[in-house]
């Protein structure tokens, strides 16, 4: 039971651009004290945008942590205070691929790495796309490319290890069950 554990203290070890690292102190139900380092993250939103032709619009983006470009669905950090996740989704679609979704359907919400992080992610299916001015943000986005991929091709790329991004793997599979792809 989670309510039988108590957090008694938390100290920020590092305040970063994307996340904070904290050391939290807890007491177990038996009264034993222990500490854990935890990544505090505001959360993220991603969208599986499906074009009129049924293909998924993806981005190939440089990811510094992996030191390579990877193919993924549009996504971004929930870095605007009190912004609803649906609004973050629309903002990210505009920034990364220059579209707005006429229809957003929540596919799921999940904990990215609950063993060490509080980051939660929302994944949406975006349909009825309309073109808007692209609003590129940051160095990585200025070098990303946009690709249209069929569901069958995306699922094949997941199976062969070409697509390795977790949110993309989850989002493509969930969306494919709804739109009949894959």
PLM segments and residue spans:
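Conserved Nudix-box catalytic region and its N-terminal flanking loop in Nudix hydrolases
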Residues: 2, 46-91, 133, 140-141
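Nudix hydrolase/Nudix homology domain
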Residues: 5, 32, 69, 106, ...
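Acidic, metal-coordinating catalytic segment for phosphate/diphosphate chemistry
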Residues: 10-46, 52
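Active-site segment of metal-dependent pyrophosphate-handling enzymes
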Residues: 20, 42, 51, 63-65, ...
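Short, well-ordered beta-strand micro-motif
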Residues: 23-25, 49, 125-127, 148-150
């Amino acid at each position: 039971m989670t309510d039988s554990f108590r957090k008694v203290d938390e100290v920020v070890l590092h305040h970063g651009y994307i996340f904070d690292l904290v050391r939290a102190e807890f007491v177990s139900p038996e009264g034993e004290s222990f500490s854990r380092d935890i990544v505090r993250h505001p959360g993220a939103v991603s969208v599986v945008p499906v074009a009129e032709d049924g293909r998924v619009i993806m981005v190939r983006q440089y990811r510094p942590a992996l030191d390579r470009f990877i193919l993924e669905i549009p996504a971004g950090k929930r870095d605007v205070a009190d912004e609803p996740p649906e609004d973050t989704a629309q903002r990210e679609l505009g920034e990364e691929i220059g579209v707005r979704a006429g229809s957003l359907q929540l596919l799921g919400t999940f904990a990215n790495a609950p063993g060490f992080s509080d980051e939660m992610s929302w994944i949406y299916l975006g349909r009825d796309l309309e073109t808007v001015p692209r609003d590129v943000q940051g160095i990585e986005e200025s070098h990303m490319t946009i690709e249209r991929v069929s569901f069958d091709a995306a699922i094949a790329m997941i199976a062969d290890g070409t697509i390795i991004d977790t949110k993309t793997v989850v989002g493509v599979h969930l969306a494919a069950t709804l739109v009949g792809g894959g």
